[in-house]
């Protein structure tokens, strides 16, 4: 990604090498180290909590794992080489490194865009077509879609292997090696425009339309009431009182489920909005430079574009922690599990509500949890221990 705005063909004129300001180098190294370091740790934690926590293995979280892996690839392949470039002022990874690192950069970028598109479509089906979701929004299908996404982007990004080469610029005081193009801008500019349309414009238009439909269902449509709730005439009969209690419990559970889905949708919508905003400077620069005879390459603005990209790849775990109680609890458990002292397990009794699905592999699109309160205690209960085990069942709101 360091060659987006491009090194041109090899230069042979002996001119003094442009000196990069020291403050620019210091700011670049510090920002990239902090953002990429935190982002790498955060995305690794996302992958670990979903893989190690059974109740977190949902179709939506499966797509978030794919997004986390793609973001990791961007942070490592695009962010860290930026540090060496700032220190040495030259490409130090050789020809093979030029091909492989650039390939991984665009693979991560495009896979993250496709992962966002995938979970947007999954959310739309789950909320707007709940009957179809039982068969379409499953964990096994999500894994197949993710495999297809990575296979498609892996093949698509192979074109960079045929476009790149090492460019050597000779100056009076130094020889600078850069990872650039073996073709002129007239040939690679259409590739950038196609990339811009396929992996930015189309996903953002699709996300805008689908989240509009989702918002209409979740936030604008009236929530249907439970007809069983109107049972005041049964108060004097003990059997009818139990039915009334179960009716209220069911209605509260329904409201909790709707609230949970709203919270999940808000979180994913924030991810999409930040993706659109933080990628806009770089994508705009690419489009503008495609039509300029001399590309705009001001150092500080290029740094701003890169920092926005790194922020986009690093900020998602923070969003999950702030907006999802499940992820917050899972992150806390991952950090504290090994340090937690041995204590007597606390016993809880809660009533469980399940949706019946035909196959055990067909999970609901999110775990519809309930808050543990006295309201949900009933005659049929399940006891479990609050221990630091991977198989622990956690009840919280998304």
From Swiss-Prot:
GO cellular component terms attached to this protein's record: plasma membrane
Domain of life: Eukaryota
Protein name per the record: Thyrotropin-releasing hormone receptor
Gene: TRHR
Keyword Transmembrane helix carried by entry: yes
Subcellular location: Cell membrane
Positions annotated as glycosylated: 3, 10
Membership in a protein family: Belongs to the G-protein coupled receptor 1 family.
Record GO biological process: phospholipase C-activating G protein-coupled receptor signaling pathway
Keywords: Cell membrane, Disulfide bond, G-protein coupled receptor, Glycoprotein, Membrane, Receptor, Transducer, Transmembrane, Transmembrane helix
Taxonomic lineage from the root: Eukaryota, Metazoa, Chordata, Craniata, Vertebrata
């Amino acid at each position: 990604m360091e060659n987006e705005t491009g090194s041109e063909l090899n230069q042979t004129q002996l001119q003094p090498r442009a000196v990069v300001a020291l403050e620019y180098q210091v700011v670049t190294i510090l920002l990239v180290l902090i953002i990429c370091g935190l982002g790498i740790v955060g995305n690794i934690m996302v992958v670990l909590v979903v893989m190690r926590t059974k109740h977190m293995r949902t179709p939506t979280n499966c797509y978030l794992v794919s997004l986390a892996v793609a973001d990791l690839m961007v942070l490592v392949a695009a962010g860290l080489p930026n540090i060496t470039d700032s220190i040495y002022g030259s490409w130090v990874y050789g020809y093979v490194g030029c091909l492989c690192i650039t390939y991984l950069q665009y693979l991560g970028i495009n896979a993250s865009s496709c992962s966002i598109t995938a979970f947007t479509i999954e959310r739309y089906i789950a909320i707007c077509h709940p009957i179809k979701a039982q068969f379409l929004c499953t964990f096994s299908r999500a894994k197949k879609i993710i495999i297809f996404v990575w296979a498609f982007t892996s093949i698509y990004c192979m074109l960079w292997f045929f476009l790149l080469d090492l460019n050597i610029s000779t100056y009076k005081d130094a020889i600078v090696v850069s990872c650039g193009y073996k073709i002129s801008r007239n040939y690679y500019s259409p590739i950038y425009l196609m990339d811009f349309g396929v992996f930015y414009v189309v996903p953002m238009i699709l996300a805008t339309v689908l989240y509009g439909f989702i918002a209409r269902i979740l936030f604008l449509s009236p929530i249907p009431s439970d007809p069983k709730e109107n049972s005041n005439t049964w108060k004097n009969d003990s059997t009818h009182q139990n039915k009334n209690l179960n009716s209220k419990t069911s209605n509260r559970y329904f409201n909790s489920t709707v609230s949970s889905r709203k919270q999940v949708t808000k979180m994913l919508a924030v991810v999409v909005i930040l993706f659109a905003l933080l990628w806009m400077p770089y994508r705009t620069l690419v489009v503008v430079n495609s039509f300029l005879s001399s590309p705009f390459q001001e150092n500080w603005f290029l740094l701003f574009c890169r920092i926005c990209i790194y922020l986009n790849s690093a900020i998602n775990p923070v969003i999950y922690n702030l907006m999802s109680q499940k992820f917050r609890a899972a992150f806390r458990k991952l950090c504290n599990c090994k340090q937690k002292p041995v204590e007597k397990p606390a016993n809880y009794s809660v009533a469980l509500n399940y949706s019946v699905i035909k196959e055990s592999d067909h999970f609901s699109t999110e775990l519809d949890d309930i808050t543990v309160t006295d309201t949900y205690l009933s005659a049929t209960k399940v006891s479990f221990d609050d221990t630091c085990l991977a198989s622990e069942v956690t009840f919280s709101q998304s």
